[in-house]
Amino acid sequence: MPLQAPDIRSAKRLVVKIGSALLVDGEGLRRQWLSALALDVAEARTRGTQVILVSSGSIALGRRVLHLPPGPLALEQSQAAAAVGQIRLARAYEEVLAPHGITTAQVLVTLEDTEDRRRYLNSRATMETLLGLGTVPIVNENDTVATDEIRFGDNDRLAAQIAVTVGADQLVLLSDVDGFYSANPKEDPTAERFDLVETITPALEAMAGDPVSGLSKGGMKTKIMAAKTAVAGGCAMAITEGSAMRPLKALEQGAARTWFVAQGDPQAARKRWINAMKPRGTIRVDAGAVQALQAGKSLLPAGVVAVEGNFGRGDPVEIAGPMGEVLGRGLTRYTAVEAVQIAGHRSAEIVAILGYSGRAALIHRDDMVI
């Protein structure tokens, strides 16, 4: 049986990346297009799909407000434009989604927030909470403080990192190109679009040209890098041309696109990632905690009897039973020093012991392999 392309209607958690050229044109913000996208988001949510939007456009929007000249901007100018544009971008999303009863939340991140384990855990916890509360997070690269990210325009990779961080099963890159081609279709009339990519091979990567529009900075190479990150994390990814009204509806109805097939599901990919890490310490638990962990529960401080090693928040640790038998691995939400202090205590006592409020679980079940 031939491999089937993913169906956007079946997505449980969908990340949509919106390129600058789609949001902003010579006249400013494309509000009518954004309102049409809001219809797509509202429709997806009625199907039970959780939606996260990763949006470019703050610099492109801000530079018009500040009347900056066309062409490349100095780093400081880009950061200033981002500071002005982020406010207007967040307001625009709020205005088009609010009529559908959708609450938006602005989340500003950089690639470092997903690559550093401690910050990764914090970002993940925040996003999970926002989704659980029924919001649509609007994620934007924090171009006001970022440096390399501004120079290289990496929101494609950022979107893939966000998709993996939140365990999304589908990522859609709305772009100014309608898929991945064997060559640059603007230069080679014989270039063919791939409808479905099962494996990203070196030969396929070599086909990636570097088409760059006047407003967006991400070329096809960054999209292939994003696809590699996404599919390895169990998330299917599509590249599609998004300028049409209701671009997600168009994708659903068979618009031109390239789908990159996921390697397994997001949770399994995450478990493999955690299991491959080298432990920085060991947390030994009592018999009651063993039963709770085997039943799929999180590890609470009350079940901890000993802490070994020197580890920080977000570091991988080994989880051992009363006799030292290895039960699994997980990412700890506390440092070794903090874990020693709260070991054996109820979660409600954490504030009194540490002097500040922390997570209820020492290791959350989603950050654990047993």
Swiss-Prot record:
* One Pfam family of this chain: AA_kinase
Q: Which Gene3D superfamilies would you find in this protein's record? A: Acetylglutamate kinase-like (3.40.1160.10), PUA domain (2.30.130.10)
Domain PUA, by residue range, is: 280-357
Give any GO molecular function from the UniProt entry.
Answer: glutamate 5-kinase activity
EC top class, as a word: transferase
Where does it mainly reside? cytoplasm
Q: In which pathway does it act?
A: Amino-acid biosynthesis; L-proline biosynthesis; L-glutamate 5-semialdehyde from L-glutamate: step 1/2
Which biological process, per GO, is one annotated for this protein? L-proline biosynthetic process
SUPFAM superfamilies from the xrefs?
Carbamate kinase-like, PUA domain-like
* A GO CC annotation given for this chain: cytosol
Per its record, the protein catalyses: L-glutamate + ATP = L-glutamyl 5-phosphate + ADP
Q: What is its EC number?
A: 2.7.2.11
Q: Does the keyword Magnesium apply?
A: no
Q: Which UniProt keywords apply?
A: Amino-acid biosynthesis, ATP-binding, Cytoplasm, Kinase, Nucleotide-binding, Proline biosynthesis, Transferase
| Binding site residues for ATP | K17, S175, D176
The regions listed as transmembrane in this protein's record are: none
Could you say which protein family the record assigns here? Belongs to the glutamate 5-kinase family.
**PANTHER family per UniProt:** GLUTAMATE 5-KINASE, ISOPENTENYL PHOSPHATE KINASE
Give the protein's biological function: Catalyzes the transfer of a phosphate group to glutamate to form L-glutamate 5-phosphate.
> What name goes with this protein?
Glutamate 5-kinase
From which organism does this entry originate? Answer: Cereibacter sphaeroides (strain ATCC 17023 / DSM 158 / JCM 6121 / CCUG 31486 / LMG 2827 / NBRC 12203 / NCIMB 8253 / ATH 2.4.1.)
